[in-house]
Curated annotation (Swiss-Prot):
Domain of life: Bacteria
Compositionally biased residues, Gly residues: 895-904
Matching Pfam families: PE, PGRS
Statement: the UniProt record of this protein carries the keyword rRNA-binding: no
InterPro entries per UniProt: PE-PGRS_N, PGRS_rpt
Family of this protein: Belongs to the mycobacterial PE family. PGRS subfamily.
Gene3D superfamilies reported for this sequence: HP0062-like domain
Record-level GO cellular component terms: extracellular region
Region named Disordered: 412-431, 895-914
Identification of the protein by name: WAG22 antigen
Record domain PE: where: 1-93
Length: 914
């Protein structure tokens, strides 16, 4: 017997190409007709006239033949198109009865089919999304909560089959009564073996003038055990009168994948806390904590706390803490870095987040404290760096404490720099954080430098003591009138004392230091760098670069902060770590611009073989344009974490001001994830863009993009930073959340693409859009594309909420493949943002699947006076179900169409509900 195989999509593509070719030829013929069908004779003689008539006749004959050919071409294209449609219809007619007969007994016995997607919960009901078929299928999306005195909770997304993505949680309903509470977002559904967890639903808004609290974002769904990304937590709900809702926690990773990113806190008088990052899988890193919400109302404006980073799996690194939210009076405290897994072989603890800026418009206030660095595993690995304290017009925030290393080997985390104070003579800089304790072999962490200010500078943090082999950490240098911290002692067997170490009472230790000074002297004279020892830190206010660590081992010195002035000067770069082991120094903060622009933060120093990159310096605060944050330092080639990008500087006047952009996260080594991008600074006119996440190492994931800065009541929020691309075998990083703004919310950052040769890695999720008071809210970022086999495209980010404008559109889900040889699941489209009096945002389209895999579900439209449209479900190709269409924002709206099922096996996706 002979068989004929037809692929309708290939036939349709060929028909499109032929139609384009026909249009091109027709255009060329029309252009040539005037010059070839009626030629003028070259002269008045009969021969010239005859030649002109002959060529004109040839031209007219050619045009007549071309018209016949064009007509034939059109009929051929029509036949090809009709034939492809006939093949598709015939296959659908043949497959549907077969699937129905297969599913019927399983559905009757268990309540769920063998192959097929779960049904969506209806909008406005908070109904659960249905569970997918046992074998192949995506979970249905949870229904949105109802609008009322207290908003109704969104429904949880349905669970996936063995192969499929979990459904997205439904958005919480809006609370309208005084003291009402917005509905909680529904939890995302979990995947089983291969597939991504669903994103948590956004918390509902509270729109009353008295006492309303935004709803809590939903928890992200867990990733598939063998492949797929964990779901991101939903953003907390907006509050017009009191506290924004807390962001939802990220979902847990699978065996090899990173935990989901925590949701951003909601905007309010007091910003909501960011959600905690999800726990990493067995070999995966913890997810990054969500950024704290913007505290936006006058003297009550307090930024929300950043979420803590998720703990690493048994063998994974800890997640980075989220940045504290900025506040018009007081900045929010940053989240702490997550601890690495107990048995990790060199994985580092997560870095603490940067504290939120305080007193950005009204003059008073204090910056938020930087988060503490996470601890390494039991035996090996370096501690995470402490976060930088936030800028405060009255007082800078304290830097975070560095994390402790493993007991046998690893360096202590560097303490965070104290936040800068304002230019007034009564202002105070924040104290630097203490450096962390190392293992038996490793350097003590450097103490953070004290923060600059127009009044009293901050004191420096103490350096950590070495144990057996390693240098003591540098004592942090105090700013103007602030004392420097004590340096740590060198190791008992070998190691130099850190800067400003106290006098030892041990004769052996003093003799050891004299011998090291003698050994280092010729090397320093020849190269400007010791053999064993730390680099010197730059003095605050000078912008000097930190010195490089010793050639064998040593930490790089911290860069000095830039000087304040009309335009602030740039901070110094951190010094490089030693060749064998050593941490890169932190970049210095940019100087405050008292009547102009803030100085740029210095870049963090890079490690070489074993060690973590330094954190980029925070951009200087300013009256016009905040300084750009410094880039994070690169991780060591073999072991160590990449440095975080520095946060952009904020603006502390109510005029035309723009926040500085966050710095790019550092690049990873072979096995480490890229560093997270810095948060954008706050500005009255426009918040700064978040920094892009750093590129992942050869076998590791890209870093998370930084959140966009917040804009003022008539300004725009900054765009979230793009997620870093995965290494050759790694997953893409998640995009950062967009900043909040009165007139326009910032768009969420796009997710990073997975590496080209990945076997199970997924594209990064897009960031959520920022909220807006009276304009259009930010759109969710598009999800990144998946890797080679079994990965999922990243989910699109949810659109932001708008009180009196238009809700943000949901981001498009990432594709499960780029070329026809790839397989994987399409990412789900993000949900459109809701609006109280305007139009809801449209849901994002689901991503197209690879050769084998389900299409992504379309995102639900946002609720509003005019309903947002549901996004279309993505198509499957050979084997797999089409994605479900997204629900309309409310009854009477337009729902999204379901995607087409696979040619060989798979059901069409269900249409969304209205």
């Amino acid at each position: 017997m002979s068989f004929v195989i037809a692929v309708p999509e290939t036939i349709a593509a060929a028909a499109t190409d032929l139609a384009d070719l026909g249009s091109t030829i027709a255009g060329a013929n029309a252009a040539a007709a005037a010059n070839t069908t009626s030629l003028l004779a070259a002269g008045a003689d009969e021969i010239s006239a005859a030649i002109a008539a002959l060529f004109g006749a040839h031209g007219r004959a050619y045009q007549a033949a071309s018209a016949e050919a064009a007509a034939f071409h059109g009929r051929f294209v029509q036949a090809l198109t009709t034939g492809g449609g006939a093949y598709a219809a015939a296959e659908a007619a043949a497959v549907t009865p077969l699937l129905n007969s297969i599913n019927a007994p399983v559905l009757a016995a268990t309540g769920r089919p063998l192959i097929g997607n779960g049904a969506n919960g209806a909008p406005g009901t908070g109904a659960n999304g249905g569970d997918a078929g046992w074998l192949i299928g995506n979970g249905g999306a949870g229904g949105s909560g109802a609008k009322g005195a207290n908003g109704g909770a969104g429904g949880p997304g349905g669970a996936a089959g063995l192969f499929g993505n979990g459904g997205a949680g439904g958005a919480g309903g809006t609370a309208t009564a005084n003291n009402g509470i917005g509905g909680a977002g529904g939890a995302g559904g979990s995947a089983m073996l291969f597939g991504a967890g669903g994103a948590g639903g956004a918390g509902g808004a509270a729109t009353s003038l008295v006492g309303g609290i935004g709803g809590t974002g939903g928890t992200g769904g867990n990733a598939g055990m063998l492949a797929g990304a964990a779901g991101a937590g939903g953003a907390g709900g907006f509050s017009f009168s009191t506290a924004g809702g807390a962001g939802g926690a990220g979902g847990a990773g699978g065996l090899f994948t990173t935990g989901g990113v925590g949701g951003a806190g909601g905007q309010g008088h007091t910003g909501g806390a960011g959600g905690a990052g999800g726990a990493g899988g067995l070999f995966g890193a913890g997810g990054m904590g969500g950024a704290g919400g913007f505290g936006d109302h006058g003297t009550l404006g307090t930024g929300g706390a950043g979420g803590d980073g998720g703990g690493g799996g048994l063998f994974g690194a800890g997640g980075d803490g989220g940045a504290g939210g900025s506040g018009l009076t007081t900045g929010g405290a940053a989240g702490n870095g997550g601890n690495a897994g107990t048995l990790s072989l060199g994985a580092a603890g997560g870095a603490g987040g940067t504290g939120g800026a305080g007193g950005t418009v009204f003059g008073g206030g204090k910056g938020g404290a930087g988060g503490a660095g996470g601890n390494a595993g039991m035996l090996f690995g370096s501690g995470g760096g402490g976060g930088t304290g936030g800028f405060g017009f009255a007082a800078g925030g304290q830097g975070g404490v560095g994390g402790s290393a493993g007991m046998l080997s690893g360096s202590g985390g560097s303490g965070g720099a104290g936040g800068s104070g304002g230019p007034a003579g009564t202002a105070a800089g924040g104290a630097g954080g203490a450096g962390g304790a190392p293992g038996l072999i490793g350097n003590g962490g450097n103490g953070g430098n004290g923060g600059e200010s127009g009044g009293t500078g901050g004191v420096g943090g103490a350096g950590g003591n070495a144990v057996l082999i390693g240098n003591g950490g540098e004592g942090g240098i105090g700013a103007l009138a602030g004392k420097s911290g004590f340096g740590g002692f060198g190791g008992l067997l070998l190691g130099a004392d850190g800067y400003n170490a106290p006098e030892s009472t041990s004769p052996w230790h003093n003799l050891q230091q004299d011998i090291l000074s003698f050994i280092n002297e010729p090397t320093e004279a020849l190269t400007g760098r010791p053999l064993i020892g730390n680099g010197d830190s730059g003095t605050p206010g000078t912008g000097d670069d930190g010195g490089a660590g010793g050639w064998l081992f040593g930490n790089g010195g911290n860069g000095g902060a830039g000087a304040a002035g009309t335009n602030g000067s740039a901070g110094g770069a951190g010094g490089a770590g030693g060749i064998l082991f050593g941490t890169g120094g932190a970049g210095g903060a940019g100087g405050v611009g008292t009547a102009g622009a803030g100085g740029a933060g210095g870049a963090g120093g890079s490690a070489f073989l074993i060690g973590s990159g330094g954190t980029g310096g925070v951009g200087g605060a300013a009256t016009t344009t905040g300084g750009v944050g410094g880039a994070g330092g690169n991780a060591g080639l073999l072991i160590g974490a990449a440095g975080l990008g520095g946060c952009g500087g904020g603006a502390f006047t109510a005029g035309v001001t723009t926040g500085g952009a966050g710095g790019t996260g550092g690049a990873a080594g072979l096995f480490a994830n890229g560093g997270a991008g810095g948060a954008g600074g706050t500005g009255s006119t426009a918040g700064g863009a978040g920094g892009a996440g750093g590129a992942g190492g050869l076998y590791a994931h890209g870093g998370t993009g930084g959140p966009g800065g917040n804009g003022g009541s008539t300004g725009a929020g900054g765009t979230g930073g793009a997620g870093g691309p995965g290494g050759l075998y790694g997953a893409g990083g998640s995009g950062g959340a967009g900043g909040h703004g009165g007139m326009a919310g910032g768009g969420g950052g796009v997710g990073g693409n997975a590496g080209s040769l990945t076997l199970n890695a997924s594209g990064g999720a897009g960031g959520s859009g920022g909220s807006s008071l009276s304009g259009k809210a930010g759109a969710g970022g598009a999800g990144g594309s998946a890797g080679l086999f079994y990965g999922s495209g990243g989910a699109g980010g949810n659109g932001g909420y708008s009180l009196n404008g238009t809700g943000g559109d949901g981001g498009t889900g990432g594709a499960g493949q780029i070329t026809g040889l790839r397989s994987g699941f399409g990412g789900a489209g993000g949900a459109g943002g809701a609006s109280d009096t305007g139009a809801g945002g449209n849901g994002g389209a689901g991503g197209k699947a690879g050769l084998y895999g389900n299409g992504g579900d379309g995102g639900a439209g946002g609720d509003g006076a005019t309903s947002g449209k549901g996004g279309a479900g993505g198509n499957a190709v050979v084997i797999g179900n089409g994605g479900n269409g997204g629900n309309a924002g409310k009854a009477g709206g337009t729902a999204g169409a379901g995607g087409a099922g696979g040619l060989v096996l798979g059901r069409d996706g269900q249409h969304g509900l209205t």
